[in-house]
Structure formats: structure tokens, C-alpha cells
Amino acid sequence: MAEGGFEDRELEEIRRRKLEELQKRAELERQAQIAAAQRRVALKRILTPEALARLDNIRVVRPELAEALEQQLIALASSGRVKVPIDDETLKKILEAIYSQTRREYRFRL
């Protein structure tokens, strides 16, 4: 009988740890959703509808680029280094600048 009590306690401990893990994961997901919603509100304030649509298109194709671009746009706007609202042409120029900084050139010698 003593062995059965030990197994019950062990199972209860496993359940408790699993529940804590699920709760932590749910909380992290909730925080991520809140942060994404706050970014979206900020982007709606600093981008024209056309520029926001372009950013949404980028997000579909390259989500990691869109996230980096969002952070950069919010930083540029909050520091006053770019005129708000950012229109589609300005967004294109920012994208070109990012692309030229991150693009690697490969040269082959024959």
C-alpha cells in the first residue's frame, strides 16, 4: 500500500508540473498577442493604409522581415527620424535600404 501512495504523489507532482508549464505557455502567448496588438495600433498610426497593406503583404511572404521592419518603423517614428505618416513610397525606400544593408554579394572567380 505504501508503494501505491508514492505513485499517487508522483503522478500528482507530474500533473502539477504539467499544469504549471501549460499556464506559463498560455501566459507567454497572451503577452505575445498583447505586444502584437500594441505594435499593430502603433503601425496604424504611423503608416498610411497603402504602406500598411504593403507591410501585410511582406508579413505573408517573410514574417521575420516584417517583424524586424515593424520594430524599425516604430523606432524611426518615435525618434522623429522619419515624417509621419509613412507613405508607401517612403516604406519602399526604407525596404531598399534594409535590403542593401543585408544583401550579400557573391563573386565567383573562374
From Swiss-Prot:
Presence of keyword Ribosomal protein: no
Recorded GO MF terms: DNA binding
UniProt-listed Pfam families: dsDNA_bind
Keyword DNA-binding in record: yes
One of the record's GO cellular component terms: cytosol
Keyword set, alphabetical order: DNA-binding
InterPro entries, A to Z: DNA_bind_arc, PDCD5-like, PDCD5-like_sf
UniProt-listed Gene3D superfamilies: PDCD5-like
PANTHER family in the record: PROGRAMMED CELL DEATH PROTEIN 5 (PTHR10840:SF0)
NCBIfam families listed in its UniProt record: PRK04239.1
Family: Belongs to the PDCD5 family.
Name this polypeptide is given: DNA-binding protein Pisl_0441
Organism: Pyrobaculum islandicum (strain DSM 4184 / JCM 9189 / GEO3)
